[in-house]
Curated annotation (Swiss-Prot):
It comes from the Eukaryota. The lineage of its organism: Eukaryota, Metazoa, Chordata, Craniata, Vertebrata. Expressed in retina and retinoblastoma. This is Uncharacterized protein C1orf53. One of its GO terms (cellular component) is mitochondrion. InterPro entries: DUF5522 (IPR040807). Keywords: Phosphoprotein. It comes from Homo sapiens (Human).
Length: 145
């Protein structure tokens, strides 16, 4: 008898129709996370990269980075656009058009919480845990190459 009552209660709770309200927006959308993805990143030991501190905490300076077309090749521009689109959609990765590899976005790296040491292209931590200096990459103001 008690088992039937438990089944009736759990069945009613689990089989209930979903509410018509849409799910809440992800945290990075509500907190303005998309704005912070355009920060120019430096290794942690360089402080603020020798420049002045931003006037508003958590907001990048718009004039700190030249336009995409001035400094990147066509392939690098495509990577920057794919990464920006994937981050805007909240995706954790995208496919590199040249190699076919799955590349983690900055969102995926930020969710991890620290540098993994694999010399990732979009590492927001300045590749601080990369052991082999020959594997460290140069930051082109959009991603590591």
């Amino acid at each position: 008898m008690a088992a039937r009552q438990i089944w009736a209660r759990t069945g009613a709770a689990l089989c209930r129709q979903p509410s018509a309200a849409p799910p809440p927006a992800p945290l990075w959308v509500r907190a303005g996370f998309r704005q912070q993805l355009s920060l120019t990143l430096c290794p942690a030991n360089e402080g603020n990269c020798g420049g002045s501190a931003p006037s508003t905490p958590g907001r990048p300076e718009r004039a700190a980075r030249p336009s995409v077309s001035e400094e990147l090749t066509a392939a690098e521009r495509q990577i920057a656009e794919l990464h920006a689109a994937a981050c805007a959609a909240g995706q954790l990765n995208y496919v590199d058009p040249a190699t076919g590899y799955v590349v983690l976005t900055q969102i995926a790296h930020l969710q991890r919480g620290e540098c993994c040491g694999s010399a990732c292209r979009h590492c927001p931590y300045g590749q601080v845990n990369v052991k082999d200096p020959s594997k460290k990459k140069q930051f082109n103001s959009y991603f590591y190459v």
